Amino acid sequence: MECSTKFQFIEQLNKSKVGGNIVKRCEWCNLSEENKKYLLSDTKYWTVYLADEQDYIGRCIIVLKRHCGSLPELKDDEWMELFLLIKKYEKCIKTVFNAEHCNWSCLMNSFYKSPEPCPHIHIHVRPRYKNPVVINGNTYLDNNFGHHYSSGRTEQ
């Protein structure tokens, strides 16, 4: 296979038996109508979805609209728009719910559980709360505030 650009390489990979059509196999490129109901915001390059699990109030997922498998492959305009989205999201979540700060992560590990991985850039956003959040009379606590969200550590 001769390719002078990465784009040509990906085109060739998509045509091969090994690669299959990457976009057709990508869960983010083929998001179900059921999951699209969580849409919060849509920009030129990114889509913001409310996470279906609200273990952290305001938890969202920001998804790149085009198929792209790694952060270094982002274009300058995509980086700039992501930066502006981060600023806008944090201001909103701090104003509306009084979040102390937000954890941002781009974890691509689950894609590689498949024999034919098909990673797609998406960013997980977990607002963190020092104080209780009250919504419609219900109180939500961030019992792990000050600790990594996956530590399972809770304060008494």
Annotate each PLM feature.
Residues 2-156:
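HIT superfamily nucleotide-processing domains
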